[in-house]
Amino acid sequence: MAKIFRITGIMSKKGKDPLYFRKEYKALKPEDALEILYSEFGGRYKVKRSRIKILNIEEIKPEDVTDPVLKKLVTA
């Protein structure tokens, strides 16, 4: 059974201010959710893994999901 994880952290790009983020992913383990985050940020923002600092990874209940797309997947 897949779980939902909320990952918070800081992403920094050269010459720009750091960006704080909070993302939610559906995965089996926290490591899988982290790998999805690295893959997404690398492709979308061209950020290397070493420039992403993870502050917290927590498992959340389906009621606590804030991402509208993930919420539809969970409640369907």
From Swiss-Prot:
HAMAP family: Ribosomal_eL20. Coiled coil: none annotated. NCBIfam families: PRK00773.1-1. InterPro entries: Ribosomal_eL20 (IPR028877), Ribosomal_eL20_dom (IPR023573). Gene3D superfamilies: 3.10.20.10. Pfam families: Ribosomal_L18A (PF01775). Belongs to the eukaryotic ribosomal protein eL20 family. One of its GO terms (molecular function) is structural constituent of ribosome. One of its GO terms (biological process) is translation. This is Large ribosomal subunit protein eL20. The keyword Ribonucleoprotein applies. Part of the 50S ribosomal subunit. Binds 23S rRNA. Keywords: Ribonucleoprotein, Ribosomal protein, RNA-binding, rRNA-binding. It comes from Methanocaldococcus jannaschii (strain ATCC 43067 / DSM 2661 / JAL-1 / JCM 10045 / NBRC 100440) (Methanococcus jannaschii). Transmembrane segments: none annotated.
